[in-house]
């Protein structure tokens, strides 16, 4: 019976064939007696209780067996039999009389059952009623048929107790067998699993006592019943009754097996035959081969043939050991007994008994976890064809129960086992569809990402095997589940299936009516999911077939809460957007969930659908999703999806009557120009999930005709169903090589091309997810031009690229909103773009890749496959190139869909470099616009013009690795792209539309534009620092990503000396850069794949040079850039001069090729050499240049610092102390100009920070990136937070604690680059958030002070800057306390000690420190003045004190490393202070000795010594209070750790001692309140030890009584806001008590601090009163705080609540009403 509950829970639903209702008959001639009234209660007056006769139990058979008919007598007959058998109530004993009287007068049978149940113990477990027992049994049987669920449960419980009281000996009473056994068998078909279980347990007890009668009843009333549901239930549950113990009694199962075998020949009810055959299999497994064969041999020949035929069709040659039968009967000799024993040891025929027992071991979770792992291995060898149906059902039942396990690993492993089982079953899973879905539904409410991924795999596999409609039919039965999360996930799975499978696979009308009730669900999330589902349904139905959809909506709108749902659905459809699938298969909603009516993001337009969502109950939960991402803002089904995109796809349809997902017919533009932009606009980066169908493996040959085949692409890939064809989506490939190896595999090879539709914009646009592209190609120029509404891409005929890039790892980043540019292509490749004014702003996008060039001699000219949009070009003089306007491009400009992931970028071959067009502005002006034309002709000399180009010889750079890892190439070459890209974005403000940051740049292609006179330092740089003649008339713009400065790739960059290793001093740079995509939101701009330094005797028209810091720099001057006079008449071969008058944008760092400008004027042709830059190469270069770099660097440092140190030497100690905070101008200037030391490749400069257009989404993405294990992503996330702090501080403040915690964790990161980026991020947080960081000082300062002991100079330097920013911006009092608490106590006091030396220190305190904090600061200063700084602690020596800055080569001295230089001076100051301290009357030696003693005891390793120290401290506080008060900070700094000691005894003693000391010390505790409260509260109020919890509560209460409550206000507010569990409740209640006492004295401060906590509690509290992630019910505490504030503030509280989101005000009003009602 152990397995009975599990199997019962998974009974498949059987159809209700008929209903049965007992009809009452009346006898008018019979007078109504008391007994008949009892029957009347059970018959008529009990209709309220027994209305299940036609409802709950309407599936009873229409006709019953004769035995049942005889038993189910009218109630009058029952009552009369009671009267007759009793002979009157007076004839029974007194107890029977009382119970009978209760049955007469009870309002319902449940009271009678309870009375009978209570009487059982007094009767020794016996029922009594010796003369009325038969009538009683019949009445109970009537209840089992007619009664409601509760009555049946009570009746079965009573019968179970009675049978257990009678024991197992002896036969069943005849009355019991006749009256109750048939009704118990009928109960086996109950829908309620609990009732089935109880009935089965009673039958099991009866089977032991009267097996013959029970088996006969099971056959007659169950297996041979006219009710098909009852027959199936009996057959399914019968094997469960036949346990091993019962079989040992020698039960004769002949009739049972014959009855089951009869059903095998019934072909009309195949399902019933299958159930019967499964029952026989399970019985055979339990009987063993010998006994089962004996039963089968006794079957009639016809039945035996049916059985053998079924056996062969089911198992074929693989017959289980207990079914190994000959066709004509049985073998004479059974199989060896050993086989039987070994196989009988298998539970469910699958798993060993020992493993089964360990799976159910509730004592040791590790044992269960290991057992689940072993179960996976067992299932890997499992053959479903050799396992009986019933065994598999039992096995699924086991998995069903395991999914209830409290251990996550067990649940996750069980899901994996279930998934593996579904895979192994294949198409056979259809037989077990119900149980598998029932088990899977159990975990739908789980919000963990891995759980979501696992059950999505299960459902998708089920849909693949049996079709989506069958799965959804069973799944939608759970749409009324009590858990709203389950309901939401059910709808989401429906959306996923609709987006994955064609509409022909669904019954869309039925699906619409099934999903419609979710539209009026009480929960917002379910409503939103339903709206998204209806959008997909409308898409699947088409525009002309949506009437059924609206009929379904009409049906639910008529409900009580359905008013407005039709408007909501129509508004949702009018948005013309569809949800889509992410990489993991989760659903990403198109419309975000508005958190409140006033807090919607500006990108979400107000509408009836959003109002409908807001009308639902708020059920916000903790956001992990994403982080668990923030589901309210992200709405990615699965919440923790790394692919976050809030830009939704616009519809291609323009007609008013068209739905957003309708296909557009291809239009004709120009000559045979197919427009695909309408289709492509519907696609976005994550519409393309990784799939083997969309990847080309590495090494796949690509030829001229390579393109996607015409096959249907499921909707999870493309939002419209348009097929890809060679006309729309070709892969350009051809050239001199016959085949080409294209690298297209790797992780997350997402194919997105919403970016290539010709739109530009910021985060809100489709272009925000641009990445990098990769291909391998030699000797080919490639360029890309996107014309108006024309879908084009770049790529030559031997390359396969994508116009939008790939991030280095899965996911995409959201970048700040920057203006974007649209650089043109070369007139030698495409004639100048001429675009209409209307389309120019949105649709002119150009991408250019630059790859190194060897020579273009001999390269065949590719034939274009399409006509292209032409451009109008003009030379620098304004003369139009008419002959070029008809040219055709050398490459096909249509979208290429395949791209390789950035993580596997490589340089196995060089890549074509597009020449920059001459006479075309790379950044369009706002003035003139042109018209659209077409190219007619392609010049023959295009492929000959670069003939003379030769690369610069860089062979001496010693790059010996020719087969560099492709994965390394991507990240190292990113830096040049980013540094230039960010600078141009910074400079593009003059030409961007200031009114709309998301708008694209306006085009201007005429040379008469006023932009021609723009500053050279703006228009002289292409995106990667490329300088060309054309760039003299261009402006630049791009979107910066995390900064990667070239100085870390070429360590000699910057203003430092730049020795060259080039062999020839007579070289010219020809072309070494690459333009990034002109779209404005690239998380990782296109990478430069390689460099090619070429030389020419004279720069050609299309030649470019790299400029930037250090290009023509010298030892003594900052790098300069070329002005417009740099290049003069290079067309004629003239030499050019350099003008070093203009500073380039900071951060554009080029390669300093030569220090002498004249070396560029004489050029020789030399052998070309390509340089492939990668991570490994970059490290090698730095290694080889290390000595050289350090040599120049140290010389420069020493030269510049020499005067500084000398000036410092003559300055007074106080002046030196102040200067230690601010380095000299020379040092500062030097550090600013030394990017290799002060800037890492990933950290963005302050000047490069830009605002986000969607800061809420960016914040969520930043937290997700910080949680990623990839260190580069962590740095990206830190840069995001810096941007948010600079421009969106109000958004950042909403999650400041969570963000700060994440940043602090990265400060501890072992990778120095990440650690340093986190320190810089903290510095910016202090700078921009100012006093908002007060609450976070304890954690941030502690980690910064710890980090100050690092050996890396640059980290110490940044830590100093961060601490300086902290001191300058946060509340001074909090800063001082945090510094003292930060672990570096001596140095914290030392900083305050230095500040005291300032002559205006007290004035500054009074000016900047709030009056309420001023007394405490002055007390701290006074203590320092009296006692001095003290000696440096011997037990915690400073790491910096042991370090010598002169011993570290290449270190840049800063304030942190120059402390040793001040050492002697500081000691002098200390000695002066010590002299002052000696004048204090207290014996300083005694005080120091006492401190050493007491702190030694408090910090002792032995817990007994620590307890003695605590007791000693209490004794000293009582007897020598002055000594303790004089050293209170130092003493309690050691004592606070004992308040949360790991030893519970020490912890408890410390708390009790603290409780006693508080009344003694009282206000003397004020300097240490901020350190005490966290130590008292954080762990202790959540302690499971009742003693510790009570002691902590007493300490908090004592603090409230004896310490100024104003000092407690801020710490209590902080703890009430950020603690969780019981501690949060307690601190909130204490805060309410403080408000009551403090408000009259400090009203403004109380409101300022406490209201923040109240809004936090009200805003995050769910309907159940709990907080996400906090645990426990906070409603009562919140109500108390609300009441306290309302009592003090009155109506003003409600007025201030009106400025908060509506749900906060609503919650406040509800709580206030609740408290008022409670008082009444």
Swiss-Prot record:
Domain comment in the entry? The TOG regions are composed of HEAT-type repeats that assemble into a solenoid structure. They mediate interaction with microtubules.
Membrane-crossing ranges are none
Recorded disease is: Joubert syndrome 37: A form of Joubert syndrome, a disorder presenting with cerebellar ataxia, oculomotor apraxia, hypotonia, neonatal breathing abnormalities and psychomotor delay. Neuroradiologically, it is characterized by cerebellar vermian hypoplasia/aplasia, thickened and reoriented superior cerebellar peduncles, and an abnormally large interpeduncular fossa, giving the appearance of a molar tooth on transaxial slices (molar tooth sign). Additional variable features include retinal dystrophy, renal disease, liver fibrosis, and polydactyly. JBTS37 inheritance is autosomal recessive.
Task: Identify the stretch(es) annotated as TOG 4.
Answer: 1484-1720
- Residue ranges of region TOG 2? 352-596
InterPro entries tied to this protein: ARM-like (IPR011989), ARM-type_fold (IPR016024), TOG (IPR034085)
On whether Cytoplasm is a keyword of this UniProt record, the answer is yes
Instruction: State the residue spans of region: Disordered.
Output: 794-924, 970-998, 1067-1087, 1430-1462
Q: Where is this region: TOG 1?
A: 94-312
Biological processes annotated in GO: axoneme assembly; cilium assembly; microtubule cytoskeleton organization; non-motile cilium assembly; positive regulation of microtubule polymerization
GO MF annotation, one: microtubule binding
Map the HEAT repeats onto residue numbers.
175-212, 214-247, 251-289, 345-384, 390-427, 431-466, 467-504, 506-543, 1294-1331, 1335-1372, 1485-1522, 1526-1563, 1567-1605
Q: Point to the regions of Polar residues compositional bias.
A: 794-809, 819-829, 842-852, 868-877, 1073-1087, 1446-1458
Record family assignment: Belongs to the Crescerin family.
Species of the source? Homo sapiens
- Which SUPFAM superfamilies does this entry report, sorted A to Z? ARM repeat
Does the keyword Repeat feature in the UniProt annotation?
yes
- Write the record's keywords in alphabetical order, separated by commas: Cell projection, Ciliopathy, Cilium biogenesis/degradation, Cytoplasm, Cytoskeleton, Disease variant, Joubert syndrome, Repeat
As given in the record, the signal peptide range reads none
- For this entry, the protein name equals TOG array regulator of axonemal microtubules protein 1
Annotated region TOG 3: where?
1256-1425
Pfam families the UniProt entry points to = CEP104-like_TOG
* Subunit and partners: Interacts with ARMC9, CCDC66, CEP104 and CSPP1.
Q: Which GO terms describe its cellular component?
A: axoneme; ciliary basal body; cilium; cytoplasmic microtubule
Where is the protein situated, by its record's location annotation?
Cell projection, Cilium; Cytoplasm, Cytoskeleton; Cytoplasm, Cytoskeleton, Cilium axoneme
């Amino acid at each position: 019976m152990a397995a009975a509950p599990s199997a019962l829970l998974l009974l498949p639903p059987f159809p209700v064939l008929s209903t049965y209702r007992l009809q009452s008959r009346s006898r008018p001639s019979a007078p109504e007696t008391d007994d008949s009234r009892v029957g009347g209660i059970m018959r008529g007056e009990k209709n309220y209780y027994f209305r299940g006769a036609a409802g709950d139990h309407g599936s009873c058979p229409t006709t019953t067996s004769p035995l049942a008919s005889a038993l189910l007598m009218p109630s009058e007959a029952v009552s009369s039999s009671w009267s007759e058998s009793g002979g009157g109530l007076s004839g029974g004993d007194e107890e029977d009389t009382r119970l009978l009287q209760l049955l007469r007068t009870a309002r319902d049978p449940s009271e009678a059952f309870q009375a009978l149940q209570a009487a059982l113990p007094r009767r020794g477990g016996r029922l009594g009623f010796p003369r009325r027992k038969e009538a009683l049994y019949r009445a109970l049987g009537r209840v089992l048929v007619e009664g409601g669920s509760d009555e049946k449960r009570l009746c079965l419980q009573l019968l179970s107790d009675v049978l257990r009281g009678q024991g197992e000996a002896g036969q069943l009473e005849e009355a019991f067998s006749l009256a109750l056994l048939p009704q118990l068998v009928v109960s086996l078909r109950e829908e309620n699993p609990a009732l089935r279980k109880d009935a089965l347990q009673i039958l099991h007890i009866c089977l032991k006592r009267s097996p013959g009668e029970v088996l006969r009843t099971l056959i007659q009333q169950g297996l041979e019943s006219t009710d098909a549901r009852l027959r199936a239930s009996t057959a399914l549950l019968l094997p469960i009754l036949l346990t091993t113990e019962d079989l040992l009694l020698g039960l004769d199962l002949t009739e049972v097996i014959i009855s089951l075998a009869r059903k095998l020949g019934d072909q009309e009810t195949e399902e019933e035959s299958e159930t019967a055959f499964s029952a026989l299999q399970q019985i055979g497994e339990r009987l063993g081969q010998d006994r089962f064969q004996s039963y089968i041999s006794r079957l009639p020949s016809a039945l035996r043939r049916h059985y053998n035929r079924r056996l062969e069709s089911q198992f074929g040659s693989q017959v289980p050991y207990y079914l190994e039968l000959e066709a004509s009967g049985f073998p004479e000799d059974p199989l060896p007994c050993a086989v039987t024993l070994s196989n009988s040891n298998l539970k469910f025929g699958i798993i060993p008994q020992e493993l089964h027992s360990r799976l159910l071991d509730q004592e040791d979770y590790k044992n269960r976890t290991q057992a689940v792992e072993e179960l996976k291995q067992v299932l890997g060898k499992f053959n479903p064809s050799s396992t009986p149906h019933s065994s598999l059902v039992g096995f699924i039942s086991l998995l069903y129960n395991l999914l209830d396990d409290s251990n996550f690993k067990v649940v996750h492993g069980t899901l994996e086992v279930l998934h593996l089982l579904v895979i192994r079953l294949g198409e056979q899973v259809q037989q077990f569809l119900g149980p598998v879905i029932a088990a899977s539904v159990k975990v739908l409410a789980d919000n963990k990402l891995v759980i979501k991924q696992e059950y999505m795999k299960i459902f998708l596999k089920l849909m693949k095997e049996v079709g989506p409609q069958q799965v959804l039919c069973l799944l939608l039965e759970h749409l009324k589940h009590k858990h709203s999360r389950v309901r939401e996930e059910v709808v989401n799975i429906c959306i996923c299936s609709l987006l994955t499978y064609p509409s022909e696979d669904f019954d869309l009308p039925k699906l619409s009516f099934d999903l419609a009730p979710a539209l009026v669900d009480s929960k917002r999330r379910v409503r939103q999911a339903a709206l998204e589902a209806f959008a997909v349904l409308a898409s699947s139905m088409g525009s002309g077939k949506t009437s059924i959809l609206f009929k379904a909506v009409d049906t639910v709108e008529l409900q009580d809460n359905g008013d407005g749902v039709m408007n909501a659905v129509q508004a949702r459809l009018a948005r013309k957007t569809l949800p889509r699938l992410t990489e993991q298969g989760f659903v990403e909603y198109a419309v975000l969930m508005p958190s409140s009516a006033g807090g919607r993001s500006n990108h979400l337009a107000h509408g009836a659908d959003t109002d409908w969502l807001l009308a639902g109950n708020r059920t916000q939960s903790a956001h992990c999703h994403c982080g668990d991402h923030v589901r309210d803002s992200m709405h990615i089904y699965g919440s923790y999806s790394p692919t976050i995109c809030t830009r939704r796809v616009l519809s291609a349809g323009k007609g008013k009557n068209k739905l957003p997902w309708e296909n557009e017919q291809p239009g004709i533009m120009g000559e045979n120009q197919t427009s695909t932009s309408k289709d492509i606009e519907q696609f976005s980066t994550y519409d393309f999930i990784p799939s083997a169908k969309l990847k080309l493996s590495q090494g796949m040959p690509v030829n001229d005709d390579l393109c996607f085949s015409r096959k249907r692409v499921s909707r999870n890939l493309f939002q419209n169903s348009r097929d890809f064809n060679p006309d729309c989506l070709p892969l350009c490939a051809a050239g001199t090589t016959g085949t080409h190896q294209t690298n297209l595999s790797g992780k997350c090879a997402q194919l997105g091309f919403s970016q290539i539709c010709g739109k530009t914009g910021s985060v809100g646009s489709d272009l925000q997810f641009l990445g990098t592209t990769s291909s391998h190609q030699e000797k080919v120029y490639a360029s890309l031009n996107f014309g108006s509404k024309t879908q084009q891409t770049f790529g030559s005929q031997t390359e396969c690229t994508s116009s939008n890039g790939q991030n280095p790892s899965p996911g995409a980043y959201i970048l700040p909103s920057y203006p974007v540019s649209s650089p043109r292509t070369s007139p030698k490749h495409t004639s100048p773009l001429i675009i209409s004014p209307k389309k120019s702003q949105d649709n002119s996008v150009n991408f250019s890749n630059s790859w190194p060039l060897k020579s273009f001699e001999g390269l065949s000219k590719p034939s274009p496959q399409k006509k292209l949009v032409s451009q109008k070009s003009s030379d620098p003089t304004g003369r139009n190139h008419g002959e070029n306007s008809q040219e055709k491009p050398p490459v096909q400009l249509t979208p290429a869909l395949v791209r390789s992931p950035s993580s596997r970028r490589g340089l196995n071959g060089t890549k074509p470099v597009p020449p920059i067009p001459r006479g075309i502005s790379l950044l369009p002006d706002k003035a003139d616009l042109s018209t659209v034309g077409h190219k007619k002709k392609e010049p023959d000399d295009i492929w000959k013009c670069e003939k003379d180009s030769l690369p610069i010889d860089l062979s001496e750079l010693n790059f010996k690795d020719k087969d560099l890892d492709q994965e390394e190439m991507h990240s190292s070459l990113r830096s040049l792209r980013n540094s230039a890209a960010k600078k141009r974005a910074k400079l593009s403000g003059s030409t961007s539309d200031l009114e709309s940051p998301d708008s694209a740049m306006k085009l201007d292609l005429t040379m008469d534009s006023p932009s021609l006179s723009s500053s050279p330092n703006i228009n002289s740089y292409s995106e990667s620092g490329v300088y060309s003649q054309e760039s003299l008339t261009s402006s630049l713009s791009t979107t910066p990503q995390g900064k990667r400065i070239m100085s870390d790739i070429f360590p000699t960059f910057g203003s430092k000396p730049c020795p060259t290793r080039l062999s020839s001093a007579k070289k010219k740079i020809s072309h070494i850069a690459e333009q990034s995509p002109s779209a404005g939101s690239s998380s990782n701009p296109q990478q430069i794949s390689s460099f090619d330094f070429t030389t020419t005797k004279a720069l050609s028209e299309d030649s470019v040079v790299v400029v930037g810091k250090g290009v023509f720099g010298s030892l003594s001057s900052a790098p300069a850039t070329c002005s417009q006079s740099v290049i003069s008449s290079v067309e004629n071969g003239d030499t050019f001069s350099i003008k070093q008058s203009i500073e380039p944008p900071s951060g554009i760092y080029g390669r300093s090729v030569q220090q002498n400008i004249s070396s560029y004027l004489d050029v020789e042709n030399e052998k070309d050499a390509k340089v492939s830059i990668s991570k490994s190469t970059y490290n090698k270069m730095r290694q080889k240049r290390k000595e050289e770099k350090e040599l120049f660097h140290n010389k420069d440092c020493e030269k510049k610092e020499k005067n500084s140190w000398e000036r410092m030497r003559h300055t007074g100690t106080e002046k030196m102390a102040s200067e230690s905070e601010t380095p000299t101008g020379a040092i500062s200037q030097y550090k600013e100009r030394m990017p290799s030391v002060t800037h890492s490749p990933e950290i963005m400069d302050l000047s490069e920070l830009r605002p986000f257009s969607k800061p809420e989404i960016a914040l969520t993405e930043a937290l997700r990136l910080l949680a990623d294990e990839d260190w580069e992503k962590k740095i990206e996330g830190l840069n995001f937070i810096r941007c948010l702090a600079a421009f969106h501080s109000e958004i950042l403040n909403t999650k400041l604690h969570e963000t700060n915690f994440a940043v602090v964790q990265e400060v501890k990161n072992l990778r120095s680059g990440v650690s340093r980026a986190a320190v810089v991020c903290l510095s910016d947080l202090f700078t921009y958030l100012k006093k908002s960081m007060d609450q976070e000082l304890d954690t941030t300062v502690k980690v910064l002070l710890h980090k100050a002991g690092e050996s890396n100079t640059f980290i110490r330097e940044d830590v100093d800057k961060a601490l300086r920013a902290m001191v300058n911006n946060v509340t001074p009092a909090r800063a001082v306390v945090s510094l003292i608490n930060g672990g570096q106590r001596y140095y914290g006091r030392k900083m305050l000690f230095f500040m005291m030396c300032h002559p205006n220190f007290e004035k500054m305190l009074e000016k900047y420190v709030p009056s309420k904090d001023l007394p405490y600061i002055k007390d701290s200063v006074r203590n320092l003045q009296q006692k001095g700084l003290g000696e440096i602690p011997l037990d915690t020596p400073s790491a910096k004190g042991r370090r010598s800055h002169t011993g570290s080569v290449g270190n840049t001295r800063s304030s942190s490393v120059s402390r040793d230089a001040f050492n002697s001076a500081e000691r002098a100051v200390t000695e002066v202070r010590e002299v002052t301290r000696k004048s204090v009357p207290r014996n300083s030696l005694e005080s120091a000795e006492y401190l050493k003693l007491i702190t030694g005891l408090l910090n002792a390793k032995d817990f007994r010594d620590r307890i003695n120290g605590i007791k000693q401290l209490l004794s000293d506080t009582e007897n020598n209070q002055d000594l303790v008060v004089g050293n209170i900070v130092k003493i309690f700094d050691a004592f606070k750790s004992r308040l949360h000691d790991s030893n519970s005894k020490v912890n408890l003693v410390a708390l009790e001692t603290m409780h006693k000391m508080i009344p003694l010390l009282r206000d003397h505790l004020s300097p240490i309140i901020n350190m005490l409260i966290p130590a008292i509260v954080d762990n202790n109020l959540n302690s499971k030890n009742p003693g510790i919890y009570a002691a902590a509560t007493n300490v908090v209460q004592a603090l409230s009584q004896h310490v100024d409550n104003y000092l407690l206000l801020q710490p209590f507010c902080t703890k009430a806001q950020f603690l969780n569990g019981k501690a949060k409740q307690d601190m909130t209640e204490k805060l309410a008590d403080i408000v009551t006492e403090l408000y009259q004295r400090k009203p403004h401060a109380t409101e300022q601090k406490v209201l923040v906590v109240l809004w936090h509690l009200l805003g995050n509290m769910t309907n159940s009163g709990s907080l996400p992630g906090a645990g426990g019910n906070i409603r009562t505490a919140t109500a108390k705080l609300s009441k306290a504030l309302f009592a003090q503030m009155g109506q003003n509280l409600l007025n201030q609540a009106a400025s908060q989101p509506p749900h906060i005000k609503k919650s406040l009003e509800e709580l206030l009403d609740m408290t008022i009602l409670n008082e009444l």
